[in-house]
Regions:
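Short beta-strands within extracellular/lumenal beta-sheet-rich domains
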Residues: 31-42, 163-173, 281-286, 364-378
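Short, surface-exposed beta-strand/strand-loop-strand elements in extracellular ectodomains
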Residues: 59-67, 190-198, 395-410
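Aromatic, loop-rich ligand-recognition surfaces of beta-strand-rich domains
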Residues: 262-268, 277-413
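Carbohydrate-binding surfaces of carbohydrate-active enzymes
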Residues: 1-156, 214, 226, 230-232, ...
Length: 413
């Protein structure tokens, strides 16, 4: 049980930027950790408004006057938060954590923090929409090295502060040392340090709920543990286990993209393109006969090269009229006929998660055809696509014959 806490808002350093434009982690010479962006509301908004962050890499939390409002999770393709009534002088904070970096492939250029802009959208009395871009940002740098965590100002844990975002510190004594697993299920999201060593990251969503603690980094007598929790714990308590917990998934909301009883109806629809993909590994590019415009794009997989009843896609990009990749940040999966979420995290949004090693997969035994529908959030001109099958040798279950449908209106079910 932890007896000391260093609340986030009591331990903000001096701002590295006192006023200016939004900057990324790279602009601020930050490789990892968190940035807190702060600005002051200049115009009152009576009633509901929407805060849109373009783009938040990777996990952002929104606060007004220190009160938590909502989160923007890049993994879930989120970009907006519904805001309460805002008054002139209200302080808006956006607390952004960098989750990790990709060191290979085209996705290596992946800046962290808020990479473009922040806007407030609200409705006037005549029902017209107004977008305000927020400017003049303070930026606070919060590195994640042990020294920064140890130097924070700690205070005793009590009923009021035991669930706040920040650092939790405790000491414990050992008569004998050995390997163990630290159970982090009662904490939210963050990192663990033991005796000055960074042990690893945790996130309550799982499936991994424990961190491996090497016995060589423990010592007889007194040991120190610091937990940085960017979302706050349910209870500041951990325990050591003999065995790891690596299969306890706690996702929010539905994991799949097909409602109960929902079946795609393509009768009467005409494909804008049909073709055959090559077998084997590596990216493939397909160009349509002519560009088309629409919001929803459906890929219908008719079979696979391995002649089995399921298919896989690792990554998918759509190309504009100039052959350039369209931004995938506003994308969401409108529908997938089948997703394997039992043998692994292989749901349909893996086709645009920037991870070439993950993939969408249907379940074994579910017959073709298979369908995935991408919602691009607004009409776009699409002239083709780039597709990457699984990375394993031979690209198992890669799509062979396919059709593509594009519409401005949602497909029928």
């Amino acid at each position: 049980e932890f007896n000391e806490v260093a609340p986030l808002y009591s331990n903000l350093p001096e701002p590295s930027q006192k006023s200016g434009p939004l900057k990324t982690f790279e602009d601020m010479d930050m490789g990892w950790g968190c940035l807190l962006y702060r600005t002051t509301i200049q115009q009152a908004i009576d009633g509901e408004s929407i805060l849109k962050v373009t783009e938040a890499h990777d996990y952002a939390q929104v606060f007004v006057n220190g009160r938590y409002i909502g989160k923007i999770d890049r993994i879930r393709r989120e970009s907006t938060v519904h805001m309460p009534t805002l008054h002139v002088g209200d302080v808006l904070d956006i607390y952004v954590e960098a989750l990790g970096r990709i060191n290979f492939g085209r996705a290596i250029k992946d800046f962290k923090g808020i990479t473009e802009k922040v806007e407030l959208r609200y409705t006037l009395s005549d029902n017209s929409l107004v977008d305000i871009e927020l400017r003049d940002w303070q930026i606070f740098c919060l590195p994640d090295d042990y020294r920064a965590q140890a130097q924070m100002k700690y205070e005793p844990v009590n009923e009021k502060n035991q669930g706040v975002r920040g650092n939790y510190r405790a000491t414990f004594r050992l008569n004998k040392v050995g390997d163990t697993f630290i159970n982090m299920e009662k904490f939210g999201k963050g990192q663990v340090y033991v005796n000055g060593h960074a042990i690893g990251r945790f996130w309550q969503i799982g499936p991994q709920q424990t961190l491996y603690m090497p016995g060589c980094w423990l010592r007889k007598g007194e040991n120190e543990i610091i937990v940085t929790d960017v979302t706050g714990p349910r209870e500041p308590v951990i325990e050591g286990l003999r065995q790891p917990v690596i299969d306890r998934l706690k996702l929010e909301g539905p994991q799949t993209h097909r409602l109960q009883g929902q079946t795609l109806d393509l009768s009467g629809e005409q494909p804008i393109h049909a073709g055959t993909l090559k077998s084997g590994n590596g990216w493939q590019e397909v160009r349509f006969d002519k560009p088309v415009s629409g919001r929803y794009l459906c890929i219908e997989a008719l079979n696979s090269h391995w002649n089995r009843e399921y298919c896989c896609i690792s990554e998918l990009y759509l190309l504009d009229g100039n052959g350039k990749r369209l931004s995938r940040e506003p994308w969401s999966v409108a529908y997938a006929d089948d997703e394997d979420v039992t043998t692994g995290n292989k749901n349909a949004d893996k086709v645009f998660d920037l991870q070439e090693s993950t993939f969408w997969s249907t379940n074994r035994g579910v017959p073709f055809p298979h369908h995935i529908i991408i919602d691009m959030s607004q009409d776009q001109t699409v002239a083709g696509f780039q597709i990457l099958p699984r990375m394993e040798e031979g690209a198992p279950e890669s799509i062979k014959d396919y059709k593509v449908y594009v519409k401005s209106e949602p497909f029928r079910y």
